[in-house]
């Protein structure tokens, strides 16, 4: 079973009618993943024993539908590695809230997708389990850190996958792979069972080829959770109710900082075409400013690395995961962490530890926290007079494998247009805008709205999707 031309609705219809059984669907999905992943390497673990729930109720749209899970989201009894050597053999004995909700909706968890180690990266090249390739061009990166989930969807291995987004890790790979991806409002989806990177920024979201499929999955995973104090108890609307609408009268803000000369010409033209499409259909386009955009990258890396240095203290080689051979306890800690963590993770632990140190805390971490407040205020001001903010997801399309992995500053700057949404805790998504006329690779159109207003994000994304029908295109890298 290849999902390039399938949706959750089409699968639901086939399962309801008996055109295919849920058991056969799972088997066919696994067979297709094995075949396709020889090229893509989107999965770390495939559950070859995956079986649908018993007594399927096809009134549940996800009943019997195979879903992939990013490998930093805990799955009971199914290996969860965060793409790290230090967790290479970790098999959890409990379930994350989002996976429990998917199983309650009778979805079939088919496997765990590749990612940058501990979600630290923008290319899925820091994984202990090897690079993931971009289905549009096998010599290009799929983006990161949710590159495996994005590539699995784009290559038709699954119809939808969960990812996580700390500074753009759903939206950037969605952009690079020509699919839809949404990071919900911070607190809209429980983080219980998400392996923490930066706890004030992390959010679980959904990736799919079609906008409606992500809406269907978000309907299931969103909502309150007693085990996560940061989750809102606000009622979860039916996100599919925001689809099939026009954009007449919608107030659309375009930050001038997002359309600068730093954005590749092919990316800028594709994004401008979508803005003109909105204008032509009655949307009100307003040029605005996000004046603190130039500070978002250093602010983010100070805050995120500081939180990561604390969160990753728990990996010590004692309770679970990789343990190095050692002569004494101190050596267990030192060698297990030195050998278990990759270079990028160690780099961020060191940066965070420095930013939190006595001599640097006021100068770095405290200042970054203050700038984060200013970034939030920038968004609040714009949303007083606008419904959504739009622009590119990234300044460039997917870059060559191994071309930026050794240039940390360039790699970090890949996130300059996505970080702010995490800082402000607002919902943000990427929907395909077309192919770049200069590189021939997919371009993502970013849509942001105020907190808990995923509805407007889905409305605009669905309108763009229905207008350009990018989903009809097949990734060139899959052609034999």
Swiss-Prot record:
UniProt keyword annotations, A-Z: ATP-binding, Ligase, Nucleotide-binding, Protein biosynthesis
Reactions mediated catalytically: L-glutamyl-tRNA(Gln) + L-glutamine + ATP + H2O = L-glutaminyl-tRNA(Gln) + L-glutamate + ADP + phosphate + H(+)
Gene3D superfamilies noted in UniProt: Amidase signature (AS) domain
PROSITE patterns on file: AMIDASES
Protein name from the UniProt record: Glutamyl-tRNA(Gln) amidotransferase subunit A
EC number: 6.3.5.7
Role, per record: Allows the formation of correctly charged Gln-tRNA(Gln) through the transamidation of misacylated Glu-tRNA(Gln) in organisms which lack glutaminyl-tRNA synthetase. The reaction takes place in the presence of glutamine and ATP through an activated gamma-phospho-Glu-tRNA(Gln).
